[in-house]
Amino acid sequence: MTLAKIELLKQLLRDNEAKTVLRQTTVDQYNIIRKFNTSRIEKNPSLRMKWAMCSNFPLALTKGDMANRIPLEYKGIQLKTNAEDIGTKGQMCSIAAVTWWNTYGPIGDTEGFEKVYESFFLRKMRLDNATWGRITFGPVERVRKRVLLNPLTKEMPPDEASNVIMEILFPKEAGIPRESTWIHRELIKEKREKLKGTMITPIVLAYMLERELVARRRFLPVAGATSAEFIEMLHCLQGENWRQIYHPGGNKLTESRSQSMIVACRKIIRRSIVASNPLELAVEIANKTVIDTEPLKSCLAALDGGDVACDIIRAALGLKIRQRQRFGRLELKRISGRGFKNDEEILIGNGTIQKIGIWDGEEEFHVRCGECRGILKKSQMRMEKLLINSAKKEDMKDLIILCMVFSQDTRMFQGVRGEINFLNRAGQLLSPMYQLQRYFLNRSNDLFDQWGYEESPKASELHGINELMNASDYTLKGVVVTKNVIDDFSSTETEKVSITKNLSLIKRTGEVIMGANDVSELESQAQLMITYDTPKMWEMGTTKELVQNTYQWVLKNLVTLKAQFLLGKEDMFQWDAFEAFESIIPQKMAGQYSGFARAVLKQMRDQEVMKTDQFIKLLPFCFSPPKLRSNGEPYQFLRLMLKGGGENFIEVRKGSPLFSYNPQTEILTICGRMMSLKGKIEDEERNRSMGNAVLAGFLVSGKYDPDLGDFKTIEELERLKPGEKANILLYQGKPVKVVKRKRYSALSNDISQGIKRQRMTVESMGWALS
């Protein structure tokens, strides 16, 4: 011991407390070391913790009534001592005390806990109702993938989520909500209701809300299902050499927004590519598309991933996309190298010459097709090497074919035997590279026969693959299968790309990374309701979707449509919305249905009896030129059939699955979705003179004024400026003076509320008009 340390010890011994500690306490006690350790930074935290937890009483209790509830011992196990902890002045206790407290300790007020910790209770519910299968032992091929750690109530970007949380917890301090926040008003309202009156600190509420709204994703080794309901139990489901079969219970919370978003984007692109300016139309439709109650743009910004279609629409709307390249089903991420494109005329195997952009330069890519992953090395018109992992035969085959085509290998061009004239769903001829892709996916033997074979590698972890996708002593030239795992490539970085008029995405380097031809041709049913608020899109949907969109549009524009009808404007039937609806009416019946519907509506107008629900129901059928019987009478129908059969029909005199109306509640049900007509049906609807409808936007201001000249027609009335007066014939030819209103008021207000006043005005003038 050095002299300096002896001097230091003498100083310490002058302090009575330190003197007692140094003489009576063993030096291996963790708490003493902690108390007198001069260094603030722990050199080995893990070892320190293990050391502490090995001692009998590593924990300290705070003083107070709660601490006194823990007994000194329970069933022979010592829980705490009367010894005082030097650091906290509390009692020393064992780790068994924690178990005792959790099991036998007092239970406080838990009201509201289920609402606040909803995500944890839902997790417990899924676990309680789960089905567990057998455990299998053996090698488990786990691949690192970017996965969502827990199911979400509704995924949104972190900054958007923080605004929503502020709006839920601190509405007064949050200020005026942004549009991106107000999109989630239903969620905000629901959460405010749920959390009202809970005595839990706001910071805890904010943390739990963040857990429900903000995605936490990690790259984890996974075998099998990757949805969040499985990932939250991943530690129980698989290891290096075992797997446990598991099916979560309850309702799956996995986002159906993502699936619906993909369906919507694919349909928008399919519709846009036939337009003269695909980009312009895609942007127009995307901005008018709503999934459930949320705009598509908001979904695309909030949700991670999707497919090619989603990235194209993201780019069209000015959002960033993940760094990746697509060639049909093939997904690529550049590892090294750079290519330069030159247009060349290539003689292909069927004897035709195709003008194709050929890429020059050595390049290496990480590639993926379905569950099959690999590394591709290519040079000009040559596939040098393709290393892939074992997967489903279909995915392996598609990956090999797509890499051969993408590499633009001369053997691939020579393998074409038949015609290449494939069309996309819009009936357009595909470009040469996509023609070749489609051709060889359908006729793989032509490619493999031309490609050639070589001896399989001798390395133990590699094997060859033949044309049947089986392991073999000989292999397709340059193609090798590895027994090792090739991890899924990460694409967390985002980048801003430019988009061409024809929906091709281009990087700053000029490289085309994907386009409309890469969008899947698959069609599926959206799990959530998609509303395209533009008739240009409706014909792409199912019969039910088109019916729903058309009637929603009619309801939205009901006041204008009703006024135009009552004014006798026959061209009102020629709306774009009804043109789309015509596509689901059987072609032979369209003219007959139109003649019938127009006749019924005209009869309502002539007899001065308006039924709003009947008006809404029949209006879309009036688009086609009317077809009448030889005697000039319209055909008669009780049921109007639509394409698709089954429940796709509308009953004229009663309700049907597509369209029904309850006059008591004034609720219209279209394809199962309820819409209110309250405020849109006037009290006098069954007994109204049509003459009043002419006065929509006008006030009766007195008796006929000779100075104003002759009686005006409807067309002349419409041309009047606000404040101008004119004479008209009201009711059954009664002459009155009207003035055009200076302010634009709702037509429905004039049509309904003004009727009684106008009628009384005219009747009070009866002596002057007789």
From Swiss-Prot:
It comes from the Viruses. It is found in: Virion; Host nucleus. A motif (Nuclear localization signal) lies at residues 740-743. GO terms for biological process: 7-methylguanosine mRNA capping; cap snatching; DNA-templated transcription; symbiont-mediated suppression of host gene expression; symbiont-mediated suppression of host mRNA transcription via inhibition of RNA polymerase II activity; viral RNA genome replication. Pfam families: Flu_PB2_1st, Flu_PB2_2nd, Flu_PB2_3rd, Flu_PB2_4th, Flu_PB2_5th, Flu_PB2_6th, Flu_PB2_7th. GO terms for molecular function: RNA binding; RNA-directed RNA polymerase activity. Its main location: virion. Signal peptide: none annotated. One of its GO terms (cellular component) is virion component. Keywords: Cap snatching, Eukaryotic host gene expression shutoff by virus, Eukaryotic host transcription shutoff by virus, Host gene expression shutoff by virus, Host nucleus, Host-virus interaction, Inhibition of host RNA polymerase II by virus, mRNA capping, mRNA processing, Viral transcription, Virion. HAMAP family: INV_PB2 (MF_04062). Plays an essential role in transcription initiation and cap-stealing mechanism, in which cellular capped pre-mRNAs are used to generate primers for viral transcription. Recognizes and binds a wide range of cap structures of target pre-RNAs which are subsequently cleaved after 10-13 nucleotides by the viral protein PA. Plays a role in the initiation of the viral genome replication and modulates the activity of the ribonucleoprotein (RNP) complex. Influenza RNA polymerase is composed of three subunits: PB1, PB2 and PA. Interacts (via N-terminus) with PB1 (via C-terminus). Interacts with nucleoprotein NP (via N-terminus). Interacts with host ANP32A (via C-terminus) and ANP32B; these interactions promote viral RNA synthesis. Belongs to the influenza viruses PB2 family. This is Polymerase basic protein 2. It comes from Influenza B virus (strain B/Lee/1940).
